[in-house]
Amino acid sequence: TKTEKNLWEAFAGESQARNKYTFFASVAKKEGYEQLAAIFEETAANEKEHAKMWFKALHGGSIPDTMTCLEMAAGGEHDEWTEMYPRMAKEAKEEGFPQLAALFTMVAQIEKEHEERYRELAENLKNNQVFAREEQQVWQCRNCGYTYIGKSAPLKCPVCAHPQSYFELKKHNY
């Protein structure tokens, strides 16, 4: 319907405005205009709420459950790396913008990794492996940093009392 098309347009417009205003706030802060930065940030928060309202309207009045969100995210990332960015890279190259073509190609690779991450997370959710694994793991509380070794994360952090939802597998990336 025209109304659905308008909802998608409103969602896209508000989403883009939010990002622009966040970028503008950074510039204003850098240039020493704290009040102007705060106004951009406030407006960005307003735009986020407007986008959320339209997104909910597009999805029956609420944001879908986590599994659906993971599937939607993976699908969006898939379209970006297989269709959108390759097309944009080709067009940029044809029009004489090799640097932009290279950036589109590199970002496509990032989007592929995003898709893979979302699909793996969806599998973890489907298989009840978000907070439990078959082998011992190091779990870390995202709130206070407490670590626990076990097959599943504690139901409650013994240090800060945050629920199991705050635990994740501890990352070693250094």
Give the location of each predicted region.
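Non-heme di-metal
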Residues: 1-174
